Structures are given as C-alpha cells and as structure tokens.
C-alpha cells in the first residue's frame, strides 16, 4: 500500500508544563488549522489544553 501524502505525524504539547505527551496523525487536507485538545497531563495529574506541534 502507498503512504498517504496528506497525513502528517504531529505531537500534542501540554500548554502548562511543555511536555509532549501524545503523538497522532493529522490529515492536512481536511484539517488545515492547528489542533487544540483538552487531554490528561500525567506530570500535572490533571486535564490541560494540548496544542499541536511538528515532530522532526
């Protein structure tokens, strides 16, 4: 199977502590804007806003 060129691997970085706690894939064709999700941060032991960053 061919790899889909539109799907990009991204990281979700905690806005409070700065840790990259989650990685996921995003389709740039359908979701052009940056993702912001409320996810659990294990360091702070609470739910915080996680913002999308590029992974190298």
UniProtKB/Swiss-Prot annotation:
One of its GO terms (cellular component) is cytoplasm. The keyword Ribonucleoprotein applies. Keywords: Ribonucleoprotein, Ribosomal protein. It comes from the Bacteria. GO terms for biological process: translation. InterPro entries: Ribosomal_bL33, Ribosomal_bL33_CS, Ribosomal_bL33_sf, Ribosomal_zn-bd. SUPFAM superfamilies: Zn-binding ribosomal proteins. It holds the Pfam family Ribosomal_L33. One of its GO terms (molecular function) is structural constituent of ribosome. Belongs to the bacterial ribosomal protein bL33 family. This is Large ribosomal subunit protein bL33. It comes from Campylobacter hominis (strain ATCC BAA-381 / DSM 21671 / CCUG 45161 / LMG 19568 / NCTC 13146 / CH001A).
């Amino acid at each position: 199977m061919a790899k889909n060129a539109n799907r990009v691997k991204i990281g979700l970085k905690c806005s409070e502590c700065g840790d990259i706690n989650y990685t996921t894939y995003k389709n740039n064709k359908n979701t052009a804007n940056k993702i912001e999700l409320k996810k659990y941060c294990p360091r702070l032991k609470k739910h915080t806003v996680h913002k999308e960053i590029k992974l190298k």
